[in-house]
Amino acid sequence: MDIIKAIEQEQLKKDVPDFSIGDYVRVNVKVKEGNRERIQAFEGTVIAKKGSGISETFTVRKISYGVGVERIFPVHSPRVAGIEVIRKGKVRRAKLYYLRERVGKSAKVKTKLE
């Protein structure tokens, strides 16, 4: 089992920023279109984080043209070019799934004042 752990440690990204649930983030994703590759940004609120180590994932939710869109990203994926924390959020829950039923102002997360 030590060989598996060693390979997993080798694959971990070193430059992952410290972000938590409720933060508003911009995730830069590498998208392959035909024979060229470009970077596409996905901005939204982090509503969940799961797992640890190489299998750690987080869910980002945004509203696009009045429709809620959620994407699950592996933190250490080579497809994720970068994660930027735009705004820190102040929440008291580990999972913000209740935001799925909220619309408008009630779906906002308070900003953490540091």
UniProtKB/Swiss-Prot annotation:
GO terms for cellular component: cytosolic large ribosomal subunit. GO terms for molecular function: structural constituent of ribosome. Gene3D superfamilies: 2.30.30.790. Keywords: Ribonucleoprotein, Ribosomal protein. SUPFAM superfamilies: Translation proteins SH3-like domain. InterPro entries: Ribosomal_bL19 (IPR001857), Ribosomal_bL19_CS (IPR018257), Ribosomal_bL19_sf (IPR038657), Translation_prot_SH3-like_sf (IPR008991). Pfam families: Ribosomal_L19. One of its GO terms (biological process) is translation. The keyword Ribosomal protein applies. PANTHER family: LARGE RIBOSOMAL SUBUNIT PROTEIN BL19M, RIBOSOMAL PROTEIN L19. HAMAP family: Ribosomal_bL19. Belongs to the bacterial ribosomal protein bL19 family. This protein is located at the 30S-50S ribosomal subunit interface and may play a role in the structure and function of the aminoacyl-tRNA binding site. This is Large ribosomal subunit protein bL19. It comes from Acetivibrio thermocellus (strain ATCC 27405 / DSM 1237 / JCM 9322 / NBRC 103400 / NCIMB 10682 / NRRL B-4536 / VPI 7372) (Clostridium thermocellum). The gene is rplS.
